[in-house]
Amino acid sequence: SAPAQWKLWLVMDPRTVMIGTAAWLGVLALLIHFLLLGTERFNWIDTGLKEQKATAAAQA
C-alpha cells in the first residue's frame, strides 16, 4: 500500500538504514573488484608483467 509506506520510517531509523546501505555497497564494490583482480582477463594491475616475462625469456 503506497500511502502507508511512510510508516516504515517510524519503525526503522533512516540514518541507520543509510549507513547500512552505504556500508553494504562499499563491501559489494570491494568484493567485485577483488574478484576481477583474481582473473587473468580483467586484472588491470598485472597487465604488463606477463609480457615482460615473455620478452625476457625470449631474449635469454
Swiss-Prot record:
GO biological process, one term: photosynthesis, light reaction
Keyword Chloroplast: no
Chain sites annotated for binding a bacteriochlorophyll: 33
One GO CC term on file: plasma membrane light-harvesting complex
Pfam families reported in the protein's UniProt record: LHC
InterPro entries (UniProt xref): Antenna_a/b, Antenna_alpha, Antenna_alpha_CS, Light-harvesting_complex
GO molecular function: bacteriochlorophyll binding; electron transporter, transferring electrons within the cyclic electron transport pathway of photosynthesis activity; metal ion binding
Sequence intervals crossing the membrane: 17-37
Cytoplasmic side: 1-16
Subcellular locations according to the entry: Cell inner membrane
Matches recorded under NCBIfam families: pufA_517_ASD
Protein family (similarity comment): Belongs to the antenna complex alpha subunit family.
Known partners and oligomeric status: The core complex is formed by different alpha and beta chains, binding bacteriochlorophyll molecules, and arranged most probably in tetrameric structures disposed around the reaction center. The non-pigmented gamma chains may constitute additional components.
Protein name as it appears in the record: Light-harvesting polypeptide B-885 alpha-2 chain
Organism of origin: Rhodocyclus tenuis (Rhodospirillum tenue)
Upper classification of the organism: Bacteria, Pseudomonadati, Pseudomonadota, Betaproteobacteria, Rhodocyclales
